[in-house]
């Protein structure tokens, strides 16, 4: 069984590398290279099911050391792979979602002359994420961490002729640099105090708040928590397949996964858990509130990602790392599907992204619309869809834990907001009369478009049930929970639906009035980009200008530099020159002063 486990896992990873090796051959320039990449990922997914089923049957974890890297005094560094529950379960999920996105990309990017390079970048994006997931030491994890960061920069700015895409790519890399500072400082602390970067050695150490703060900062940047969140909504400026892969199973969940990996240390420090809880609660409410008034369909879905990441951070703060990982897995299915559905709509409507200019699509794009409804319902936590099995457990854990009641309240309000903006997308984009140009050529009869969406729709329906049925600790149902707590998540979700429906029916025929301050606050993202991107930039510019002109130019050149020396010399020369005017009284005065000075010097 072990031989089958390791050989199948190694085969799945090797197959992923074949398209990368082909990129150095003439085959890379052929038209069927994208299809080859898609096929390799499909076979890799099928083979990865073997170790997953083997793990579910035996439940044996393993650590594999493939290559000893180097040794410096007492510090050893090897290429280690940690094959535990998180790695084995996430691998087929990531491969299935990437397979679907790759197939969708062949249709979506068919007119792009560099589609081969685009597919290669997506594949590298996946490989770096799998490197991060399977790493057994911090250095290897850091390679995957930086890999997903640089690949997100390359892919978000894929359409580099667009200013918005370049700005979004720069935002992503700069905000993540701030988080990387925390990661590097945590690595340095662990190296100094444990002389090792392997997880097994670090987890033996008595917990300390400093490295945990660095890890939380790293997760805040990578998973777009409040304060370092503005890059995520703007990351949708890249092609839709990039958004689907980035928001579902790669970049943004890396920060949460980092904290899941370090849960043995986090659970020993209540301060770090409280920080994660409060940070996640603020993030999930703020981003859900921002999503309420957005009109760009991709931006709404992007804000929903940030809100769900906040919910995962809340789960980390509750010391429930497995529930956070479960929500990562279920969220990946319907979030990827939501982005693919939005890409189908945008592509068919000639790049129109405003939901106010859509409508009636359920009759024109029935498969896409049905999948969008399934994804929206799964996002809200509707029973028996994928999101319900993880989201309901998180709300139950919040209700039954002795934690900050404000965090619980904020999370419940954010859950209601999720139902509101999901319903708003369904009503404006899919129902009622069409509000787009009749010249749009709409057609979804393409297997490259329909098959990925169908595949992810099935996953959005069944993934939660399958994951919670066969994996501990969710297989045991708690029996001591009061009924009113058990149905809390469902009640607030239904309230959100009712609220959205009432608001839509009430305001449908009303004349437009100037927006309220709350609407403006939500629509402008809490003024956060305005404050953080303009004010500090202007202050730094003026500070740098003043330092350059006042301190450097004025002080160095004018006061103490060449001009300063010449001005001082000029003063002395002027005094000496004025003393030599040819007046007899000045000569007699100097004659009288000179002898006393000479006598004084001789005596003392």
Swiss-Prot record:
Gene Ontology annotations for the cellular component aspect, listed alphabetically: mitochondrial inner membrane; respiratory chain complex I
EC assignment: 7.1.1.2
Entry keywords, A to Z: Electron transport, Membrane, Mitochondrion, Mitochondrion inner membrane, NAD, Respiratory chain, Translocase, Transmembrane, Transmembrane helix, Transport, Ubiquinone
Any one GO molecular-function label of the UniProt entry: NADH dehydrogenase (ubiquinone) activity
Membrane-spanning segments: 4-24, 40-60, 88-108, 115-135, 138-158, 172-192, 201-221, 240-260, 272-292, 300-319, 324-346, 359-379, 410-430, 456-476, 481-501, 584-604
GO biological process, one term: electron transport coupled proton transport
Highest taxon listed in the record's lineage: Eukaryota
Classification via InterPro entries: NADH_DH_su5_C, NADHpl_OxRdtase_5_subgr, ND/Mrp_TM, NU5C-like, Proton_antipo_N
Family named by the database record: Belongs to the complex I subunit 5 family.
Functional note: Core subunit of the mitochondrial membrane respiratory chain NADH dehydrogenase (Complex I) which catalyzes electron transfer from NADH through the respiratory chain, using ubiquinone as an electron acceptor. Essential for the catalytic activity and assembly of complex I.
Protein name per UniProt: NADH-ubiquinone oxidoreductase chain 5
Organism field: Ornithorhynchus anatinus (Duckbill platypus)
């Amino acid at each position: 069984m072990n031989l089958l486990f390791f050989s199948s896992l190694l085969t799945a990873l090797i197959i992923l590398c074949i398209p990368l090796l082909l990129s150095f051959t003439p085959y890379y320039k052929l038209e069927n290279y994208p299809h080859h990449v898609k096929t390799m990922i499909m076979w890799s997914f099928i083979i990865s099911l073997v170790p997953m089923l083997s793990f579910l049957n035996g439940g044996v974890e393993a650590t594999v050391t493939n290559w000893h890297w180097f040794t410096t005094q007492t510090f050893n560094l090897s290429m280690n792979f940690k094959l535990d529950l998180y790695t084995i379960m996430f691998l087929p999920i990531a491969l299935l979602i990437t397979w679907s996105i790759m197939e969708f990309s062949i249709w979506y990017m068919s007119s792009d002359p560099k589609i081969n390079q685009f597919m290669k970048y997506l594949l590298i994006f996946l490989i770096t994420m799998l490197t991060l997931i399977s790493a057994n030491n911090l250095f290897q994890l850091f390679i995957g961490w930086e890999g997903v960061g640089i690949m997100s920069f390359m892919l978000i700015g894929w359409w580099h002729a667009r200013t918005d895409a370049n700005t979004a790519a720069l935002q992503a890399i700069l905000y993540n640099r701030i988080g990387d500072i925390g990661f590097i400082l945590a690595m340095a602390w662990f190296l100094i105090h444990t002389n090792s970067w392997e997880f097994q050695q670090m987890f033996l150490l008595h917990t300390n708040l400093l490295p945990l703060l660095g890890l939380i900062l790293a997760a805040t940047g990578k998973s777009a928590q409040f304060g370092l969140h503005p890059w995520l909504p703007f990351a949708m400026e890249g092609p839709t397949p990039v958004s689907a892969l980035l928001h579902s199973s790669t970049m943004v969940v890396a920060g949460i996964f980092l904290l899941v990996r370090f849960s043995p240390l986090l659970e020993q420090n209540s301060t770090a858990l409280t920080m994660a809880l409060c940070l996640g609660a603020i993030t999930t409410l703020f981003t859900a509130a921002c999503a309420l008034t957005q009109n760009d369909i991709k931006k709404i879905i992007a804000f929903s990602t940030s809100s769900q990441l906040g919910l995962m951070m809340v789960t980390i703060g509750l010391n429930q790392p497995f529930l956070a990982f479960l929500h990562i897995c279920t969220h990946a299915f319907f979030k990827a599907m939501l982005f693919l559905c939005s890409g189908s709509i945008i592509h068919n409507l000639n790049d129109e992204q405003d939901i106010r200019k859509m409508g009636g699509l359920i009759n024109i794009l029935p498969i896409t619309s049905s999948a969008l409804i399934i994804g929206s319902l799964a996002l809200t936590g509707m029973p028996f869809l994928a999101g319900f099995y993880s989201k309901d457990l998180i709300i139950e854990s919040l209700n039954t834990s002795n934690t900050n009641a404000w965090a619980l309240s904020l999370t419940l309000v954010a859950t209601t907001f999720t139902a509101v903006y999901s319903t708003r997308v369904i009503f404006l984009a899919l129902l009622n009369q069409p509000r787009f140009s009749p010249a749009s050529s709409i057609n979804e009869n393409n297997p490259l478009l329909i098959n990925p969406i169908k595949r992810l729709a099935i996953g959005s329906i069944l993934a939660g049930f399958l994951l919670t049925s066969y994996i501990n600790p969710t297989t045991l149902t708690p029996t001591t929970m009061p009924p009113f707590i058990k149905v809390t998540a469902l009640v607030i979700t239904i309230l959100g639906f009712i609220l959205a429906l009432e608001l839509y029916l009430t305001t449908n025929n009303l004349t437009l009035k100037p927006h309220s301050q709350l609407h403006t606050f939500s629509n402008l993202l809490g003024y956060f980009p305005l404050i953080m991107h303009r004010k500090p930039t202007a202050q730094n510019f003026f500070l740098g200008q003043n330092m350059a002109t006042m301190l450097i130019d004025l002080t160095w050149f004018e006061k103490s530099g060449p001009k300063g020396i010449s001005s001082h010399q000029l003063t002395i020369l002027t005094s000496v020159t004025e003393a030599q005017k040819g007046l007899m009284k000045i000569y007699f005065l100097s004659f009288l002063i000179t002898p006393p000075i000479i006598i004084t010097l001789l005596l003392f």
